[in-house]
């Protein structure tokens, strides 16, 4: 019988080496800021896009627009810091799935390549975790 405490996968982190953690933090910073830049751009042109923004899941263009901005800015911030890491990734993954399947579904590869790239990185990061240099791991170790 194992004496280990059962951990919730959503909040547990696998052990990583220093080199792996460095690579993960670099990936979080690079892809997090790249993804965040899309949200900041949308926020800047908010007034021009609210009525014309795609609404593939029927929430209305304004609400869909706000949810995408939330995923691209706020969740990117959590992704970069490694704070509520997997929880932050869920809206980011969902946003990229919707963009890929519904918004850009019939577009050529050159148009859907960013969504495929982000989706791939986000899914991989969901399963690897944020690495040792993250708020989640630091908070867990302080307990």
Describe these PLM feature segments.
Residues 1-44, 62-70, 77, 81-143:
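Extended, low-polarity transmembrane helix blocks
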Residues 43-51:
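Membrane-interface helix-loop junction between the first two transmembrane segments
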Residues 50-61:
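Perimembrane loop-to-helix junctions flanking transmembrane segments
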